[in-house]
From Swiss-Prot:
The keyword Lyase applies. Pathway: Cofactor biosynthesis; molybdopterin biosynthesis. It comes from Methanocaldococcus jannaschii (strain ATCC 43067 / DSM 2661 / JAL-1 / JCM 10045 / NBRC 100440) (Methanococcus jannaschii). Belongs to the MoaC family. The gene is moaC. The lineage of its organism: Archaea, Methanobacteriati, Methanobacteriota, Methanomada group, Methanococci. Its EC number is 4.6.1.17. This is Probable cyclic pyranopterin monophosphate synthase. The active site is at D123.
Amino acid sequence: MLTHVDDKGVKMVDISKKEDVERICVAEGYIKLKPETIKLIKEQKIKKGNVLTTAQIAGILAVKKTYELIPMCHPLPITSVNVDFEVFEDKIKAICSVKTTYKTGIEMEALTGVSIALLTIWDMVKSAEKDEDGQYKTAEIFGIRVVEKIKK
């Protein structure tokens, strides 16, 4: 049975009768970059500024805006957001952990946080990643997924 569709059309599910429950979700994803770009990020030599700090802020903001971006997501009280990065030779892993005590899950918030953090990295390093024809031969976002979902 589809919970978001009835004979009148699309609707948002009524969660008013559900109890508040502590929920935690961790999502991750990767961006593949040229090793030279990773070096510039580590040395903080990217022209637009500090890549990882900017991406961290963007990821946090994205979590808080998820309900405005995804039509069937409920606005919910976010009690904690953490966006971290692991930097490898040719890629960066973004990890977004989100916590709430509410009636519905926070998977979409964690996934949105990771996605926007990775997109922000791409935006920050565009000039370093383009080849002589203006193409992105190396840059790739991949592996976005929910790593862990906890409902207490």
